[in-house]
């Protein structure tokens, strides 16, 4: 775990999650600003969120994995894909990035267009219980899309993961906006709520629904549909951040050999 944290690549990845979430929140919320001359449409907002996540997944995905979502990060932790420490740093970076993105938009947008900065809220007589189910389903399909389209074990052509993920986010918004404003991402809900200081009694919905949905998708995908062949020892090593793939072990064999020889002398 110490080795992982001390690497430059680790902190590049954490910064990439911060930057990606900042940009995602800025563009997503920006598409929902209520300009007096032209109110946003459901289609406009849905496409904007989808384009934003697709663009960022393509641009910064190679650096950090392009989670940009605490629910996805926690699901990948449960799915034994990342270490506990990486998950903690990623979630912290995502939340700070969301606050920064919402804050920048608040500062730039005029008061007559700002509105409530697209803070998520229940609408159309949606109860908290129903809202949780809606967010669970929306995030479940998003998480499955992410896991499947980015699975390195797949040998068949998968197309563009960034495009698939962007379309999945767009799909979720086309349905979810009518119920909850569509979150699918606790950071997206948390950022504007902090900036506007508007935490409704139902704010928990935008944490519980997405996290449960993503975790259920991870359990289904990584343990039932496409289980990993890693041993229990290797699974523990992944969570601790000490797991080294066989390819890396071969690459570093000579380095280890020299170290052993020096120690022997």
From Swiss-Prot:
Cytoplasmic side: 1-12, 61-65, 75-87, 148-158, 225-265
Predominant location: membrane
GO molecular-function term, one example from the UniProt record: water channel activity
Protein keywords: Cell membrane, Cytoplasmic vesicle, Glycoprotein, Membrane, Repeat, Transmembrane, Transmembrane helix, Transport
Residue numbers on the Extracellular membrane side: 34-39, 109-126, 180, 192-203
Keyword Transmembrane helix on entry: yes
Entry note about domains: Aquaporins contain two tandem repeats each containing three membrane-spanning domains and a pore-forming loop with the signature motif Asn-Pro-Ala (NPA).
Name the UniProt record assigns to this protein: Aquaporin-5
